[in-house]
Amino acid sequence: MIQDVKNTAEQKMQKSIEALKADLSKVRTGRAHTGLLDHVQVEYYGSMVAINQVASVSLGDARTLNVQAYEKNMTPKVEKAIRDADLGLNPATNGDIIRVPMPMLTEERRRDLVKVVRSEAENAKVAIRNVRRDANDALKKLVKDKEISEDDERRAQDEVQKLTDKFVAEIDKLLQTKEAELMAV
């Protein structure tokens, strides 16, 4: 029973970390990376699909992405989707290849992005703490129902707290890494 509560808490905390990683990957730094366009949607024969379904995205260099549509007639639609994705990118078609240069971030924009990243990290910490609270409530219910002793509850709460500390430290590490990426010129 105690192990079930701890396992559930750990799984939920891990999901919070994964969600944070996904959110942080969407925040554009000055460097190009192929995951930057993952959430861009392209109209493909009447339905909206992810860009990686209709084109290959590769790194040209540290500051340029190369996008090549699998079908030549899709090139203009892919370029338009990138331009309309509200990422501040200005793609240019060169034959079949769409080159997407990464513009330099201004100091002000970097600071704004750091604020956004810190906010995302704080939201993840709140989610972790909510999982801890739910786990502790479940443990209290087990004590109330006389399924475990108070000593077992206390030990389990300590273990849940250690899990919480571990995941909060991981969030801090992710935040620090992303801030360093953003502030690197």
UniProtKB/Swiss-Prot annotation:
The keyword Transport does not apply. It is found in: Cytoplasm. Pfam families: RRF (PF01765). GO terms for molecular function: ribosomal large subunit binding. GO terms for biological process: cytoplasmic translational termination. Keywords: Cytoplasm, Protein biosynthesis. One of its GO terms (cellular component) is cytosol. Gene3D superfamilies: 3.30.1360.40, Ribosome-recycling factor. Its main location: cytoplasm. SUPFAM superfamilies: Ribosome recycling factor, RRF. HAMAP family: RRF (MF_00040). Responsible for the release of ribosomes from messenger RNA at the termination of protein biosynthesis. May increase the efficiency of translation by recycling ribosomes from one round of translation to another. Belongs to the RRF family. NCBIfam families: frr. This is Ribosome-recycling factor. It comes from Methylobacillus flagellatus (strain ATCC 51484 / DSM 6875 / VKM B-1610 / KT). The gene is frr.
